[in-house]
Amino acid sequence: STYGISQQLLMVGLVLILFALAFKMSAVPFHFWTPDVYTGAPTVITAFMATIVKIGAIVGFYRLFSVVISFYTTYNIILLVISTLTIVLGNVIAATQSNTKRMLAYSSIGHAGFIILGITVLSPSTTYVTWYYLLAYTLSSLAAFWVFYLVSEQAEQEEEISIFKGLVK
C-alpha cells in the first residue's frame, strides 16, 4: 500500500490513463476515430488536431510514463507492443489510401507509434531524439496540411490524392 492506495488500484488507474492518452494520440487499438474525424473536419481543424492536440497528449504521456516505466516493467512491454502495432498498421493502411486526409490520418497514427517507441525506450539520447522527431513531425504535418489546403481550394475532387498530379513540374 502506497499512501493508502492498494497496488492493484494504482495499476488500474495507470491503465485507464494509458488508454485515455493512447486514444488522444491515436495509438492502436484506439485509432479508429482518427481517419473519420480527419476526413470530416475542415482542413484547419484537422491540422490543429494532428499537431497541437497530439503534442499535448504526447507531453502528458511522457510526463506520466517517464516516471511509471522505471517502476513497472510490465508497462514497458505493453507500450512496445502498442508502438509496434501502431507503426505497422498506420503506415501500411496509409499506403493504400486514395483520400488525402485519410492518408494523412493513418500517417499520423504511424508517427504516433514512433514517438511512443521513443518514449518507451527512455534513455537520455532517445529522449532528445524523440522531441526532435516530434518537432519534425509537427512542422511537416503543418506543411502537408497547408499544401493540401492550397491545392484542394483549386481542385474539383478536393480530397482525392489525384489532385496532386502535376504539382512538381
Model-derived regions, located:
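Alpha-helical transmembrane segments of multi-pass membrane proteins predominantly involved
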Residues: 1-169
